[in-house]
Amino acid sequence: MSHRHTAYVGRFAPSPTGPLHFGSLITAIASYCDAKVHQGKWLVRIEDTDIPRIYPGSEAHILACIDAFGFQPDGEILFQRDRLDLYENVLEQLKAQNLVYACQCTRKMLGSNAIYSGTCRNLNLPFQNQAIRVKVKDQLICFDDRLQGIQCSNLAHDLGDFVLKRRDGIINYQLAVVVDDYMQGMTHVVRGADLLDNTQRQIWLGDLLGYPRLHYLHLPLAMNAQGQKLSKQNMAAALDLSKASQYIQQSLAALHQPAVDLDTPDRMLKQAVAQWQLNHIPHQTRLAGTYL
């Protein structure tokens, strides 16, 4: 499958499962600078399909951060909760092509097995009130990450058929992100290395749907003092909007970018774009040092 031969379109796509933290800001700044240095568009998408995990107030904090840190999205902010019918339509398309099947396996039944064995693949179960899995093949899927280099995975060996819709009716992240990246005309994805192993799944699904492949860049992760990646699950501190300029300086330093003058956030971002050096970012999955 070929790549899109169009102007750069990138995005920042946080989930409102908690407030934005320093690790989130690193991703936002890197994706913004990379888009702007290529004279591209930078879009914001709120990935809020997993309703039970949404944390009260986090969406408002995300939107406040976008404004306070001087980001200027090139279009309206998209909310996945408004697009559930679209995802269902794509699922129907996959059903019609016999590329997915219903699965009745529970977490208890699967136990600790990381690789799904295909228990339900040939049972022809009704789709109602069941999870929906997409079929994978025994083949190698590779992509050339712009920072991490060549990445390969055989989904049949490493993962097995994976879920696109949960039995509780929640659309899985993998389906929603692939559909939205295509519908929004995305060409480039800049995100954290914690999502590196999601990429082959998304490439596989995009190939099944006939979507052009994207260009990927997976950033090294900021870590806390315990050696854990900064995340909502690890209780990373929420960004303090009153310290936006200082956070921008710290984020650029973490990415090994040239220093920018302490100024208003929007002016600092403009200077960061003008000085952006992708080859300065460490070619690893973790950043040295600790970040609170």
From Swiss-Prot:
Residues the entry annotates as binding L-glutamate: 11-15, 47, 173, 191
UniProt superkingdom: Bacteria
Binding-site residues for ATP, renumbered to this chain: 232
Residues spanned by motif 'HIGH' region: 14-24
Top enzyme class: ligase
Entry-linked InterPro entries: Glu-Q_tRNA(Asp)_Synthase, Glu/Gln-tRNA-synth, Glu/Gln-tRNA-synth_Ib_cat-dom, GluQ/Sye, Rossmann-like_a/b/a_fold
One example GO MF annotation: zinc ion binding
Binding site for Zn(2+): 103, 105, 116, 120
Motif 'KMSKS' region, residue range(s) on this chain: 229-233
Keywords of the record: Aminoacyl-tRNA synthetase, ATP-binding, Ligase, Metal-binding, Nucleotide-binding, Zinc
GO BP annotation list: glutamyl-tRNA aminoacylation; tRNA modification
Stored Pfam families: tRNA-synt_1c
GO CC term, one of those recorded: cytosol
Required cofactor names: Zn(2+)
Bound cofactor: record note: Binds 1 zinc ion per subunit.
EC number(s) on file: 6.1.1.-
Family listed: Belongs to the class-I aminoacyl-tRNA synthetase family. GluQ subfamily.
PANTHER family xref list: GLUTAMATE--TRNA LIGASE, GLUTAMYL-Q TRNA(ASP) SYNTHETASE
Function field: Catalyzes the tRNA-independent activation of glutamate in presence of ATP and the subsequent transfer of glutamate onto a tRNA(Asp). Glutamate is transferred on the 2-amino-5-(4,5-dihydroxy-2-cyclopenten-1-yl) moiety of the queuosine in the wobble position of the QUC anticodon.
Protein name: Glutamyl-Q tRNA(Asp) synthetase
Native species: Acinetobacter baylyi (strain ATCC 33305 / BD413 / ADP1)
